[in-house]
Amino acid sequence: MRRWLRLLVGLGCCWVTLAHAGNPYEDDDYYYYREDEPRQHGEPNYVAPPARQFRFPPLNNVSSYQASCVVKDGVLDAVWRVQGTFYPEKGIVARVGWSGRRGRKWGRLHAPECLVETTEAVFRLRQWVPTDLDHLTLHLVPCTKCKPMWCQPRYHIRYFSYGNSVDNLRRLHYEYRHLELGVVIAICMAMVLLLGYVLARTVYRVSSAYYLRWHACVPQKCEKSLC
């Protein structure tokens, strides 16, 4: 019993720690801000500030990238600048994917315009985007000589629909995610406890029946043995 209590207390502490961990992207440039322009057709415009230069381990000759994004009247204007080593004569494959509603919806946008040099590649995309857009991902393979592994310079727009504010987005992306995690942990714990209860009850019944059958002194059994 003490072990179960310790386990429950430990899981509760972990959940509280995750819930109060805060927003890991608080100081990140991923967050967009709202323009001080008048709304058109009742829909606000969104502009994503230029992303900082992100670095990650070399993969398919890509070293770093920068990204910027503007969503205005439902039209996306995005630019990716990817630094690395490229072979323009061999060509390059680039696709832009999107997802929304916390991963429940996804799709692919048009192929971006590519300007490839030996040390830098620029990808531009201008297209209408869904209103429940969550984030964009630029998938690219720098050259055909490289192994067929996808490089994914990501740029998160963090933008669900025109009516949501930044506070609502943070709540949807983080607080609600922690709440979902807590609910999942609680359901798993309840299932484990229920399974343990059923198993313990089954073992108790089987052992009781075995004991009564072979070891307990039942009146009929005792009378027969005395005869």
Swiss-Prot record:
Membrane-related topology note: Single-pass type I membrane protein
GO cellular component, one term: host cell Golgi membrane
Organism superkingdom: Viruses
Residue ranges that the UniProt entry lists as topological domain Cytoplasmic: 200-227
Protein's name in the database: Unique short US8 glycoprotein
Segments forming domain Ig-like H-type: 61-155
Organism: Human cytomegalovirus (strain AD169) (HHV-5)
Main location: host cell
Glycosylation sites: 61
Stretches that traverse the bilayer: 179-199
Gene name tied to this protein: US8
Intracellular or extracellular location(s): Host endoplasmic reticulum membrane; Host Golgi apparatus membrane
Signal peptide: 1-21
